[in-house]
Amino acid sequence: MKKHLLILFLTLFFVACNSIKKTQEAIHKGNYDKAISLAVRNLNGNKTKKKTQPYILMLEEAFGKASQRDQEEIAFLKKDANPENLERIYNIYLRLKERQQKIKPLLPLKISKKKANARFDFKNYDEAIITLKKELSNHLYSKAKALFASNHKYDYRKAYEELKYIEEINPNYRDTRVLMQEANAKGIDYVYVSMKNETAQVVPKKLEKDLLNFDTYGLNDLWTVYHSKRDTEIRYDFGLSLNLRKI
């Protein structure tokens, strides 16, 4: 019995040491968010225990370094003044907020040796996020509208992706939904499929219908639609012939 308890104790000890080592390594390699996730996981439900003190110190360090790095990157990108950086800046602000939200439920975190709480310089990023969301939506909307002018299917598809992202971050922005439908309609490749009977037998109507029922195969997707009957109002982009040689 004592032997089993000793083995269990040693196993738990090595697991704890390994987790601390992984968190330290993540910080040293600059993987601050990984270190934060590891520390938070080990502090959940255990933050007052002595064995979790190293995680509090590492969490404080990783958070400070991660926030500083993100703020420096934002400052650089803003100085560059390139509208293509708006999405990157927006996502960094989201990351800053998400990081704080991950730590907040654990507070306060007391550092025993200092007899004080760990310090986390939390900031309110809501205004910055809302402002960036508006600027980014406007920028992507303008890009999408410009792509419409080219009248090429590939550009309509690119416009659709820009509009789709706007819809994700800023639902129902201007006429985004209407433009998405238009971009999709104009970006589709239509394929006309015909069947040639080479069997020297009469193909049963039901079999022919089943073979040309493309919904069954799941071939149609966002940008490709197959037709077995010609639509006079559609200009087909591709033709496909099915040669039936054996029934």
Where are these regions (language model features)?
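Single-residue signature of alpha-solenoid repeat helices
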Residues: 35, 88-89, 159
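Bacterial Sec signal peptide processing site at the extreme N-terminus
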Residues: 12-34
